Amino acid sequence: MAEKEGKKEKKERWGIAHIYASFNNTIITITDLTGAETFARWSGGMVVDADREESSPYAAMKAARRAAEEAMEKGITAVHVKVRAPGGHGPKTPGPGAQAAIRALARAGLKIGRIEDVTPIPHDGTRRPGGKRGRRV
């Protein structure tokens, strides 16, 4: 019992890290569990100068680190991660920055809970662009 008295149990404050990773950019938003309050919002384009580097893993890593620092200042200690690709008519796989962003969040000191893919998948909604014969290259 004596050893427990010295320890203070720190209450974890959970949030959600929404990572939108396309092949053009990576956007990281950290919100509360309901998604109503935004604690931090960073993108690859905010941390690099060249447009072609917005979607790179390096830009995603820098953006995720800054978002994590900003959220931790506001009291968030742990996050559930929701990864999203463009989906719909676009690619259904996340861009190159998704994995780098998750690793950067963990390295910054945030505890990672669930990792979930929330890419919108059409259940045969509208016709894809390109017409009957498809896109002829």
Curated annotation (Swiss-Prot):
GO cellular component, one term: ribonucleoprotein complex
Superkingdom per UniProt: Archaea
PROSITE patterns: RIBOSOMAL_S11
Region (Disordered): 116-137
Keywords, ordered alphabetically: Ribonucleoprotein, Ribosomal protein, RNA-binding, rRNA-binding
NCBIfam families with a match to the protein in the record: arch_S11P, PRK09607.1
Name this polypeptide is given: Small ribosomal subunit protein uS11
Lineage, broadest ranks: Archaea, Methanobacteriati, Methanobacteriota, Methanomada group, Methanopyri
GN (gene name): rps11
